[in-house]
Every structure is written in structure tokens, then in C-alpha cells.
């Protein structure tokens, strides 16, 4: 078990919720705006304290120092572009600073693979202030993935992403999910807040459905994301259809 969260809470934004996360598991937090998704993810990072306890690899988050946490997990928060000006390659290099000395060939190999996956290899010589919103988000995603990339950081266990698909178009979003699945297949547990419910239905191994700070359901996507539960939570009409052997959600209001 990678994460064991017991009665995690930060009232009134998040009421007590308990769950566990296994190695290689992709967990999606879904729910309306203000339901507690970002709060839950921030508390899993160990940077924000509330009530309850989160254990990472059987040890309380509060017993780790920041340097140790940086090697075990990466937290990609929602944030605007920083005020400083730096090149994309330099920015990505900063993501590896917590890992100490690394083999240059291994770094270049990982950098090539991640940048190719997110289609930002041609952006490495650009300044981050010159990037579009979608380009900047992909650079941030690349930096987060590099921090916990298994060949560079064998201690890494957890990737926390708060609405990582923000500003991405459908092609870029597809590339992101492919990269996330690749990391999960290497044993990295991934927790992310998400608004694309069809993606959650297809991509998540486990779902936590939040509403008004409460976890109203958790489990497999097919069990949690029923028409009745989604209509009640999002206050809109939902239809579930089958297309090419896959379930799809239609929002008809």
C-alpha cells in the first residue's frame, strides 16, 4: 500500500474521508467545483495540514522532512505562470534538483521520452513566459513527471495532479493520459482531480466522488459513476450509452 488516508478532513472544505491507494493505481477525484478535490490532494502532498492522518509507505506524512517527501512524491498544484523568466530546459532541470547528482545520459533519455510524449521537445529553447497556456501546462506536467520518473528516482511512489488537463486540447489531453498510464505501469500511484467524466470512466482504476466536502461514493468507476449518482451530484441529466464496446456519458441539459 502506498497511501493510507484515515479520516482526512479540513472542515468545511473537506469532511472526513478514508481511502487507500496501491502501487500503480490511478485514482480520480471528481465532483463539482468546490467539492473538496483540491483540498484532498493538497493534504496528500504533506504541505497542508488538516485533520486525520495520511500514511505514505506506512509512515505518517508528518514524520517526513520536505527533502524526503520530494523524493517520494510530486505535487502539481493549480497555479499561474511564475513571475521569474527562465528557459524551458532550465525549468525542467529544476524539477530534478531534489534528486541530487544524476547520470547525464539517464537524464537526457528521460527528458527526451517525457518531452516527446507531451510534444514539447521543440519548446526546450523557449522562455516559459513565451509559452501559450497549453504549452506551459505541458511543461509543468513534464517537470512533475521527471521528478518521480522511475529511472531517475527509484524511490518515487506517488504523483499528485490537481486538474492537470486544464488548458489542454483533446489531443494533448490524450497524450497526457497515455503518459500517466505509462508511469502507473512502472508502479507510480497517481491521484488526480478531474472534470472530464468520460476520461475518468475510461482511465481511472478507482474514483472518489465528492460533493459539498463529502465523499458520497468511492470504488470502481463503473460502480461509482452511475447515472443516478452523477445526476444527483452534478444536478444535470445524464445518459450512459455504449459505443464501440465502451461506456460513454452524455450530458443532455
Regions found by a protein language model. Give the residues of each.
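The feature captures the beta-strand-to-loop junction immediately N-terminal to the Walker
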Residues: 30-32
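H-loop (His-switch) and adjacent beta-strand-loop-beta switch element
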Residues: 207-222
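Conserved ABC transporter NBD signature motif
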Residues: 52-60, 68
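Conserved ABC ATPase "signature" region
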Residues: 107-123
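Conserved ABC ATPase signature
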Residues: 127-131
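H-loop/switch region of ABC-family ATPase nucleotide-binding domains
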Residues: 194-195
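ABC ATPase nucleotide-binding domains
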Residues: 232-253
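Helix-to-loop junction immediately C-terminal to a conserved catalytic motif
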Residues: 45
Amino acid at each position: 500500500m502506498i497511501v493510507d488516508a484515515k479520516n482526512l478532513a479540513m472542515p468545511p472544505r473537506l469532511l472526513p474521508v478514508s481511502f487507500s491507494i496501491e502501487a500503480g493505481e490511478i485514482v480520480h477525484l471528481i465532483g463539482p467545483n468546490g467539492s473538496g478535490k483540491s483540498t484532498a490532494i493538497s493534504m496528500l502532498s504533506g504541505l497542508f495540514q488538516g485533520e486525520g492522518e495520511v500514511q505514505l509507505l506506512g509512515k505518517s506524512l508528518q514524520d517526513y522532512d520536505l527533502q524526503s517527501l520530494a523524493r517520494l512524491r510530486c505535487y502539481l498544484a493549480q497555479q499561474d505562470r511564475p513571475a521569474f523568466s527562465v528557459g524551458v530546459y532550465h525549468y525542467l532541470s529544476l524539477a530534478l534538483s531534489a534528486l541530487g547528482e544524476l547520470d547525464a545520459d539517464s537524464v537526457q533519455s528521460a527528458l527526451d521520452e517525457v518531452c516527446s510524449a507531451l510534444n514539447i521537445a521543440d519548446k526546450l529553447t523557449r522562455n516559459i513566459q513565451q509559452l501559450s497556456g497549453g504549452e506551459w501546462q505541458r511543461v509543468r506536467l513534464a517537470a512533475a513527471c521527471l521528478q518521480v520518473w522511475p529511472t531517475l528516482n527509484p524511490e518515487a511512489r506517488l504523483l499528485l495532479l490537481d486538474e492537470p488537463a486544464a488548458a489542454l486540447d483533446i489531443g494533448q489531453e490524450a497524450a497526457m493520459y497515455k503518459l500517466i498510464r505509462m508511469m502507473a505501469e512502472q508502479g507510480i500511484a497517481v491521484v488526480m482531480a478531474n472534470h472530464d467524466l468520460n476520461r475518468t470512466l475510461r482511465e481511472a482504476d478507482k474514483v472518489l466522488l465528492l460533493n459539498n466536502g463529502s465523499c458520497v461514493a468511492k470504488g470502481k468507476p463503473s460502480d461509482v459513476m452511475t447515472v443516478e449518482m452523477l445526476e444527483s451530484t452534478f444536478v444535470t441529466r445524464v445518459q450512459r450509452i455504449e459505443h464501440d464496446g465502451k461506456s460513454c456519458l452524455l450530458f443532455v441539459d
